[in-house]
């Protein structure tokens, strides 16, 4: 699983400063529509000068097939590593985009947007007359069969997409709140444990990182959880009965206690050690 940091700040200078703070970390950067319209293609070049970041250009391209292919060709010339288009543009548009990009010796990954994470079931149904999961699976099959590399989806559809396509079909999941932060304008949000459980290949995290006074520390904490076998909430639930059998008075108040700990990882290590369970 890869961490993709959303550069959704108010100015180019703030975005570049954040990128500088995150140098030498194993991360991707996401440049969205706002930053691209405001700062232009030269912003991509400036980011590359800060560090050799992998860049996801998140423009969600959606138009008639030829226009989509033209747009994808142009942004691919920028040397970005991933782009996305709307799956609802249809099979012909997807085919035309992939045919156009086949001439590149090294093309970017192309993912299809399924259902925006700002949708809930009611609002999605009012437009598409389908349930979210049903539509996402349909979009995913069309995208997979016509040569795309993966899907942009919520965590809740990630595993289902792979079941209906291939384990190698990538899923990028926005709306990640790694440590239980507020969901803001996102409706279908999830944490790191859920992203891992549902086989997300890329997770997008924005506000929990760039609104923190120490964004690098937050990134490092997320990366630490990604790159090791972390004790997830599921692990805690599965071992809870075992833990309760141990004579340690914190067991009965575990959930309340862990929330009060400034260094949760260290606290969990001590907790498991006292309970005689291997960390």
Swiss-Prot record:
Q: Which UniProt keywords apply?
A: Decarboxylase, Lyase, Pyrimidine biosynthesis
Q: Its Gene Ontology molecular function terms?
A: orotidine-5'-phosphate decarboxylase activity
Q: Which residues are catalytic?
A: 60
Q: Which residues form a coiled coil?
A: none
Does the record bear Ribonucleoprotein in its keywords? no
Signal peptide range: none
**What enzyme category does the UniProt record give?**
lyase
Q: Which GO terms describe its biological process?
A: 'de novo' pyrimidine nucleobase biosynthetic process; 'de novo' UMP biosynthetic process
A matching Pfam family: OMPdecase
Its UniProt pathway annotation is: Pyrimidine metabolism; UMP biosynthesis via de novo pathway; UMP from orotate: step 2/2
Give the reactions, separated by semicolons, that this protein catalyses.
orotidine 5'-phosphate + H(+) = UMP + CO2
GO terms for CC? cytosol
Q: Which family does it belong to?
A: Belongs to the OMP decarboxylase family. Type 1 subfamily.
Q: How does it assemble?
A: Homodimer.
Q: What is this protein called?
A: Orotidine 5'-phosphate decarboxylase
Which organism is this entry from?
Campylobacter jejuni (strain RM1221)
